[in-house]
Amino acid sequence: MKKLAIMAAASMVFAVSSAHAGFTPSGTTGTTKLTVTEECQVRVGDLTVAKTRGQLTDAAPIGPVTVQALGCNARQVALKADTDNFEQGKFFLISDNNRDKLYVNIRPMDNSAWTTDNGVFYKNDVGSWGGTIGIYVDGQQTNTPPGNYTLTLTGGYWAK
């Protein structure tokens, strides 16, 4: 009986003391965010340029695009065109109205060997790479309607 009384008293003390405890916010809230990425990081630069229609002759350069690939030791660096920028084996810039196309070729400017496969332009050798690819007019396109044209390339790696 004495033991039961002690247990009851201990329960009362615990209940009383825990009833008054609680969290009161009085500061700021911090957030922890984590993005998990592939080891092979391929960053593709931006290019903005203006050309007259008369400059859109076959093989005329549109401009250089920088590519920086890190951590790609056993991977082949690759660039993938959006579905709006590739059809029937050809890359193109698409107009803002999504009707007009300006066909282009993509070539590395360091003479390294690359291959195109279904909208993916990839380096034949594995390993990290930093350099520049050139975007060139494919065919005579001096009749291209004026407007804004876009080619979107996403960096990644090629896996066979």
Curated annotation (Swiss-Prot):
| One Pfam family linked to the record | Dr_adhesin
Q: Name the UniProt key words of this record, in alphabetical order.
A: Fimbrium, Plasmid, Signal
Which N-terminal residues, if any, form the signal peptide? 1-21
**Record-linked Gene3D superfamilies:** Dr adhesin
| Any GO CC annotation of this UniProt entry | pilus
Q: List the disulfide bonds.
A: none
Subcellular localization, as worded in the UniProt entry? Fimbrium
Renumbered to this chain, region (Receptor-binding) spans 22-75
**Chief place of localization:** other
Q: What is the recorded function of this protein according to its Swiss-Prot or TrEMBL entry? A: Hemagglutinins of uropathogenic E.coli mediate adherence to the upper urinary tract. These adhesins bind to the Dr blood group antigen and also agglutinate human erythrocytes in the presence of D-mannose (mannose-resistant hemagglutination (MRHA)).
According to its UniProt record, which protein family does this protein belong to? Belongs to the Dr-adhesin family.
**Protein's UniProt name:** Afimbrial adhesin AFA-III
The lineage, from the top, is: Bacteria, Pseudomonadati, Pseudomonadota, Gammaproteobacteria, Enterobacterales
